[in-house]
C-alpha cells in the first residue's frame, strides 16, 4: 500500500478513491486500518467497504466458530487483531457510492456491484453487457469496482467499468501492486498502473505477525500468490471441497489441505 500511495502522490491526484478489502489475508490488519484512517484525515478520500470488511462486521454481530488452521485461521487472526474502533469505522462505510465531484460528471464506485459487495464481475459474459447497460439507472457513464483482484477496463460505447486490480494480492499472473488513475476532460480516461514493492519483506511479515502459523496452508498459499500472481487459495479450496465430498470429511480437516498443498506444489 505504501508503495502505491508514494507512486500516486507523485501524480498529485485531486481525490483518493478506496474500493474495499483493506483487511484479511495479509499481516497486521489493525495497523492497516490505522494507516487508512490517518491518511483519510489528511487527504480528500472516499472509502467504501468490501466483502472482507463485511466478514468482520458479521463476525462481531453474529459470531462463528472460526478456528486457527487452513480453513478459517486467517479470518480469526484478522478479527482478533482489529479493535472495536476499527470495526466501527469499517461498518460506517457504504458498499457503494454515487460520487459527484465539481468539474466532473457523476460516477459510481463499488467493491463488487452497487448492490452486493461480493459480486464477481466477468468481462466475457452477458452479465458484463447487462451491467454496463445498467449504468444508465445510476445516471453515470463510469463505474469503478474491485473484488476480483484482476485489473481491466471494460468499454461499451461511452460506458466504462474499470477494475484497478489489487494492491496486496493480485491474481492475474503479475506480482506488482496495481491501482488506477482516472482523468476527466469531458470524457473518462482510465489508466491501470503497476508498482513494484518488496515482496520478500511482505512475505516475511506473514511469519513475524503470527498469521502464517495461525492459517497453515492458507497462509502458505497467500505467500505463493504474492510471489507468483497465482490464486493458490481458490485453487486449494476447490481441491479440498472435492476431496471432502469424496471422503466424507469436513473441509476443516488439515490432511485435505496438506494434500491440496502438495498437489499445487505450495511450499
Sequence positions of predicted segments:
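Active-site neighborhood of phospho(di)ester-bond hydrolases with catalytic His/Asp-centered motifs
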Residues: 16-21, 46-51, 110, 142-149, ...
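Core catalytic region of metal-dependent phosphoesterases/phosphodiesterases
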Residues: 1-84
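Active-site environment of divalent metal-dependent phosphoester hydrolases
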Residues: 24-27, 52-57, 115, 142-155, ...
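Anionic-ligand binding region
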Residues: 128-167, 177
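Acidic, His/Gly-rich catalytic cores of divalent-metal-dependent hydrolytic chemistry
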Residues: 155-164, 168-267
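Metallo-beta-lactamase
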Residues: 70-106
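Glycine-rich phosphate-binding loop signature in dinucleotide/nucleotide-binding domains
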Residues: 8-12, 42, 101-103, 136-139
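Active-site-proximal segments of metal-dependent phosphoesterases and phosphodiesterases across multiple
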Residues: 65-69, 105-137
